[in-house]
Amino acid sequence: MNIIKRAGVFIGLVYFTVLLIIYGEHIVRSYATEDCMPAGLYYYAEGAAYTNLPVCKDEPKSSYKGTELFPTSPNIDKPLRMTTDIMVHPISSTSDLGPMDVPPDMYPMYSCPNLSNSSPLPLWYGSCINSCQITSSKETMAVTVWAINSTVDIIMGYKLTTFFETKFSHVGPFGGCSISLVGSEPRSAPEALISGWRSKILSQGNIQDAAWYLYNDPECNYFSDIYSSGFFVRIDRIKLTVLIDAVGNLYLSDLVAGSYDSYDKGFATHGNNVWIWDTDRVKVDNNCYFKQTDDTYCDYDNTTGYILCKTIGVSFRSELQTRVESPCAGHLNISTDGVIYRLEGTADTPSTQDRLSSILKNNVNLGMESLISLINDVFTNIESSYCTGMCDLMEVILSNYPTATTVLETPIGPWLPITTNGHTVMTACSSDPNWVIKTPVSYCYSKKMIKVVNKDTMREAWWRIVNSYIILNETCTDENTTSFNLVKERMELRQDITYSFWRGDLIVSYPYNKSRWITYKDEKIQRSSKWFDKLLPLRYNHPITLDNITMELINHTRDIYDVHVYPSQGSTSKRPMSDVIGRVGAAGSNLIKHLVKGIGETFFWVTQHIELICDILIIIVCVVIGYCVVLKPILYITMRGREKQQPVIVMRDEGRSHLFSRSTATNAL
């Protein structure tokens, strides 16, 4: 009976072991999915139906570098965009703004075109001297200045983020096949693929969020691991702003910092990001995007070829870049430095001396209007003695100090001196106070610039805050730059972060929620002022106030610390008491966060290696079961059969015989 029971138990254990071997891997893998995607996405492969996949939190990354099928595009420079509209950190108190004599004019006062359109210093000097002569006649032009409202439309498009992935299949010792992701790296796709993606996406209609796997999973082979590679594409639905330039070309600007992409192409590629849009969405027929900003009289300078509009603070080259025809503005000229204007008429204006002589020869009853006009011109030219002296002085200063980078208000308008190839050249600029900081703040650390936007034209530009002017074609070149790394190092040491403006320094102190202002006391920064009150002052229509700058840069600095520095900091040997007190509330949650993160990473590692773990566990279980069910009973039976028989001793006592073993006899004795 005992043998039958043992045989039944043995057969049952063998049957259970066989079932475990056959179905064990499949059961475990059903709870350990290798493929996942962000929530809301769907799977698509060429020739395959849409398939829902489980949700995972992050895009899988790996140090494994797969075979490179296409050349990797160079990195695209990007500005840091940290502050959001809802991430507002309060300024600790109004006293943090600094002393009461903080200059209020902390905004760019001028805009300058491409610095390649410059005049040699001697040529500028000749023009300056000519403007001071009361005996010289001038060619006067009636000019209307125009601006372009470049925003045409806001359309819906798609942003694609491309990764090149590598997967491999592995078959375990008991036949279970698993597929694992071993490589996922950002990579740009060739235009041939992008064109096909664009056609497919636009034909499918309104795709909100999607993910495409553009390669097949590797097949399973018991004797070798099989690899498969291809593109994984994430698709996001976004809004795109379509702009128009002065000659009517549609384009998209700043998809990445400083980018300019033609609308007619239908897509743009920067790094591993692709933007796609429908080119049939925007029509510009009979629409007007020009707006007249000024109507004034300007002087033409034969020496430099510049048109000088003193009353509006604009100087520009008379050389034409192109002419355009607008349905609402008519014929317009575009100068080589980008000013849009139209000449309404020209006339020769006699010199002040000639006009005075003419009036003296005529009847004294000419009228008060002419007399007032004459008196105004006489007083205007009283400054000619100062004017010529200032031309001489400026030429000497700029010749000996060619590194000057301040826009100067000269007798012929605002000019910027710059140095190129060892020579000082002059660039005409415009008084343009309509620039404001764009929010959320975009700060470029490599060049210490802030992105600003013109309230009239909505044009965006980068402002190098150490200067009083904007260079309209300046671009940002931030991409993990040394400058940004130095800022992070200073934050790790709890040191001040300084933003140097052209009128002083804004200092943001740890824990980066308060600031103070230091005005330049040595007066090395020259104030761009007007010569006489007769010249119109700058019209600060939309000033960037110090409060505005302070709040935005404090928010920006604090965000960088919270995102890039604080999460990666461990314990330090010396920690200020203010830091301990200020962050004691976050210590507990931070500890829990790291514990949860550690548990999650451990669980993620287990799920990634579940097939190997299951194989090992199955082998261990089989060995244990084999030992308990098969080997142990056999050993037991074998060992029992080998037990030695004890000799029997026969003892007789009073006629009775008893059988004793040797041990019993020994005990009896």
From Swiss-Prot:
Q: Does the keyword Nucleotide-binding apply?
A: no
Q: Where in the cell is it found?
A: Virion membrane
Q: Report TM segments.
A: 610-630
Q: Where is it chiefly localized?
A: virion
Sorted alphabetically, which keywords does the UniProt record give?
Answer: Glycoprotein, Host-virus interaction, Membrane, Signal, Transmembrane, Transmembrane helix, Viral attachment to host cell, Viral envelope protein, Virion, Virus entry into host cell
Quaternary structure? Homotrimer. Interacts with matrix protein.
Species, as recorded: Rice yellow stunt virus
- Report the superkingdom from the record: Viruses
> Where does it sit, as one GO cellular component term?
membrane
The UniProt function text for this chain reads: Attaches the virus to host cellular receptor, inducing endocytosis of the virion. In the endosome, the acidic pH induces conformational changes in the glycoprotein trimer, which trigger fusion between virus and cell membrane.
Q: Which family does it belong to?
A: Belongs to the nucleorhabdovirus glycoprotein family.
Where would one find the signal peptide in this protein?
1-24
> Which stretches face the Virion surface side?
25-609
Which parts of the chain does the record assign to the membrane side Intravirion?
631-669
What kind of membrane protein is this, topologically?
Single-pass type I membrane protein
Keyword Transmembrane helix assigned: yes
* GO term, biological process aspect, one: virion attachment to host cell
Q: What is this protein called?
A: Glycoprotein
Q: How is it modified after translation?
A: Glycosylated by host. Glycosylation is crucial for glycoprotein export at the cell surface.
